[in-house]
Amino acid sequence: MLKDKRTQKNSQRRRSTTNKTSSEPDEISNLKDSQKWTVNADSTMLFRYSAITFNGHKIHYDLPFSQKSEGHEGLLTHGPMQATLIANRAFASGLPIKSMKYRGLSPLVCQHPFDVEVGKDQDLIIGRVISSKNKITMQAEFTI
């Protein structure tokens, strides 16, 4: 019974997240000092990130497993890796960051370049990862 309620709750959460998220990114160009960085993650980068974070999930480094067993288009880029890339750009601003919140929105396949965008909005730094299909996969907010 408890498992059924948890499964139901997770399904509702996924549906509400999907409804809130648009495949088209909001404009970031209106943010002060916005920066865009293109990253081309490859299987070696994902394997190394898996190793240093002790993440043994095969969707990050075993292409046949990711495609055949899990049904993904390719290897998936780690959520925390995306958050780390956003944080790297945010800290490069030189502004004193007090806190960070991030949220994964959708899977990011590693075989295509993706963009990391960061910009300032009042007392926040807003960051996100945008896939080659123009879909936001990760968003972050930094309090300054």
Language-model features, listed with the residues they occupy:
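Hot-dog-fold acyl-thioester-processing enzymes
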Residues: 29-93
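HotDog/MaoC-like acyl-thioester-processing domains
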Residues: 1-41, 108-110, 117-144
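Residue-level detector of solvent-exposed, low-hydrophobicity positions
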Residues: 4-9, 54-56, 61, 68, ...
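Tryptophan-centered motif/residue detector
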Residues: 1-3, 54, 65, 81, ...
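Hydrophobic beta-strand-centered segment that forms part of the acyl-chain substrate-binding groove
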Residues: 70-73, 77-126, 132, 139-141
